[in-house]
Amino acid sequence: MIQQESRLKVADNTGAKEILCIRVLGGSSRRYASIGDVIVGTVKDAIPGGNVKRGDVVKAVVVRTAKECRRPDGSYIKFDENAAVIIKPDNDPRGTRIFGPVGRELREKRFMKIISLAPEVL
C-alpha cells in the first residue's frame, strides 16, 4: 500500500537507490498503489554515474509491497519491502536488469518486459 510520501527501494540498475512517491496515477482521488500500479516519484538517493540523478522526477511501477495483496484465488502475497522499477513513457523498464522477485500481478497489467527480466515471479 503505497501513498504520497512513501519511500520505495529501486529494484533495477538505473542508478537510483530510493524514490519518494509524489503521486499515484489512475484517477484524481486515488490514494493507494499496490503491485502493478504506476506512480510518479522523485529520486532521493542515487549512485554517481547512473542513468538517473538525485532530484529527477520519474515514473515507476510498484513490484513489491510490504502490505499483503489479495489474489483472485483467495491467497495473499506480501514482501519484506516496498520496491519499484523505473519505467519509460512506453512502460518499458529504463534499466537492463531487475533485482529480486516481482509479483505475478505485473503479468495481468501487461508489464511483460519486467516479467522477462525478473529473476523470480511470485
UniProtKB/Swiss-Prot annotation:
The UniProt GO MF terms for this protein read:
large ribosomal subunit rRNA binding; structural constituent of ribosome
Which GO BP terms apply?
translation
Superkingdom field:
Bacteria
Q: Give the UniProt keywords, A-Z.
A: Ribonucleoprotein, Ribosomal protein, RNA-binding, rRNA-binding
Name the Gene3D superfamilies for this protein.
Answer: Ribosomal protein L14
> By its UniProt entry, which SUPFAM superfamilies does this protein fall under?
Ribosomal protein L14
Instruction: Give the CC-aspect GO terms.
Output: cytosolic large ribosomal subunit
Family matches, as Pfam families: Ribosomal_L14
UniProt record similarity statement: Belongs to the universal ribosomal protein uL14 family.
Note the PANTHER family from the entry.
50S/60S RIBOSOMAL PROTEIN L14/L23, LARGE RIBOSOMAL SUBUNIT PROTEIN UL14M
Q: How does it assemble?
A: Part of the 50S ribosomal subunit. Forms a cluster with proteins L3 and L19. In the 70S ribosome, L14 and L19 interact and together make contacts with the 16S rRNA in bridges B5 and B8.
Summarize the protein's role: Binds to 23S rRNA. Forms part of two intersubunit bridges in the 70S ribosome.
Protein's name in the database: Large ribosomal subunit protein uL14
Source gene? rplN
